[in-house]
Amino acid sequence: LQESFPNLNLLFNPEFLTERSANFDFINQSRFIIGSSGQPYNEEKSNQLTELFKQRFGNTIAVLQTTYETAEMIKYMNNCFFATKVSFMNEMYQIAEKIDANWDEAVSGFVTDGRIGHTHLGVPGHDGKFGFGGSCFPKDIQAMINFGETIGIEMEVLSAVWRKNLEVRPEQDWKELKGRAVTDG
């Protein structure tokens, strides 16, 4: 896009918001990513946007200035990692059910290791269903699988994540979201 419109200063600022709490997530972001063209990055405009973020959110918030490609990669890495975490937890839940293990105790013991984190662990999830749905994870997992294959990388891990999700969430409710309008409700 930047090549098509060289006189425009385009920046890419991926969002890291959840559908159910987008307003809260926006106000409480952990970092801002600013992607721009080339090296050095569009420094003047990136710096202006950085200053705007710091004025609004304070100096303690991390701001990473990078290329378009790296900014997009960061966004996909986040969503694909969280989708992987959901699929992993669903698979562990299936095992716990089979061996009659106490799922809640198992999860409590699991998260005492601080490296695990406390998000994307619920089985069933926040929507009362197994696996992941919504408008981001299914789309982003499929996009990364297809992109990897396009550039000659076999996407075994993400393909397995996708297969597990199709198994535990056979209704594929994300397909119902096409053309959906976003509201603040």
Residue ranges and their predicted role:
Residues 97-185:
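NAD(P)-dependent Rossmann-like dehydrogenase/reductase catalytic/cofactor-binding core
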